[in-house]
């Protein structure tokens, strides 16, 4: 039996590959012997990807062009691109959710059985059960512009555009798992707490130092995650080692959620 953690012979696609978690993931996939890595980003990645697609994932046309440009089939899609709420609301929701969903829809038919889709979500999206019924209605709206109109009609939800975008990603992971699973494709998401990347400054600007520092203190490490630590979980979820995982949102929070659920927060 081969190494279930290996990516030998696998073709993978990574969005948001130029920096932070995406860049760390590309480096890790090279170490794990990935056969072909397609990097999608608006900026040129420094890492050793085999194909680079410059893309604006905030627009439907940009996402469609990126999907069309992917060289050949892919066994694993890492939908990792994301922006903070320092960007306009529609940009946040488009990049963090609509682009992710559309790439999944376009690339999944080109995957073979045993393929995997891994979303980078966030612990900021764990409030989705409070909006479950509304978000399930959104999942049924496939048209990009109609989905944006739905967001416009729900200002009570879009007030926290980043949190909502990550709630959408987590619900989509659940929603799509049934249909994808029947085609032999798994979908999971990883939900990190704050990560020590250049984007952290944007989160501090929108979520406040007080909230982020509190979240970090609830974990046993007492510090933000590193990009490498998050990339390692993503790589696991996309590998054969996670072959029995489908439709799950995995916390990467050093125990913060456990503390919340058991009333042990500081």
Go through each PLM region and give its residues.
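Short C-terminal tail/terminal secondary-structure segment
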Residues: 2-3, 246-266
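Conserved glycine-rich cofactor-binding loop
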Residues: 11, 18-19
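Short, small/polar-rich loop/turn modules that mediate ligand/substrate recognition or access, typified
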Residues: 114, 186, 245-247
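Catalytic loop of short-chain dehydrogenase/reductase
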Residues: 84-85, 90, 116-182, 194-195
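Rossmann-fold cofactor-recognition segment
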Residues: 47-61
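Alpha-helical segment proximal to the catalytic Tyr-Lys
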Residues: 109, 178-179, 243
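C-terminal helical subdomain
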Residues: 102, 158-162, 167-170, 189, ...
């Amino acid at each position: 039996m081969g190494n279930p953690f290996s990516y030998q012979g696998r073709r993978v696609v990574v969005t948001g590959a130029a920096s932070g978690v995406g860049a760390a993931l590309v480096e890790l996939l090279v170490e794990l012997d990935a056969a072909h890595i397609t990097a999608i980003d608006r900026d040129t990645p420094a890492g050793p990807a085999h194909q680079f697609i410059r893309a604006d994932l905030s627009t439907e046309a940009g996402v469609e062009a990126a999907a069309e440009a992917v060289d050949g089939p892919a066994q694993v899609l890492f939908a990792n691109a994301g922006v903070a709420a320092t960007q306009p609301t529609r940009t946040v929701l488009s990049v963090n959710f609509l682009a992710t969903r559309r790439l999944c829809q376009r690339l999944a038919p080109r995957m073979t059985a045993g393929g995997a889709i891994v979303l980078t979500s966030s612990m900021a999206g764990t409030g989705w059960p409070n909006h479950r019924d509304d978000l399930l209605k959104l999942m049924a709206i496939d048209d990009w512009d109609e989905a944006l109109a739905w967001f416009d009609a729900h200002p009570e939800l879009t007030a926290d555009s980043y949190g909502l975008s990550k709630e959408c990603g987590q619900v989509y992971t659940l929603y799509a798992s049934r249909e994808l699973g029947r085609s032999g494709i798994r979908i999971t998401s990883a939900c990190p707490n704050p990560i020590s990347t250049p984007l952290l400054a944007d989160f501090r600007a929108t979520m406040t130092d007080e909230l982020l520092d509190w979240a970090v203190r609830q974990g046993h490490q007492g510090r933000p995650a590193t990009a490498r630590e998050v990339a390692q979980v993503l790589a696991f979820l996309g590998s054969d080692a996670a072959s029995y995982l489908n439709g799950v949102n995995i916390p990467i929070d050093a125990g913060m959620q456990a503390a919340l659920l058991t009333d042990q927060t500081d």
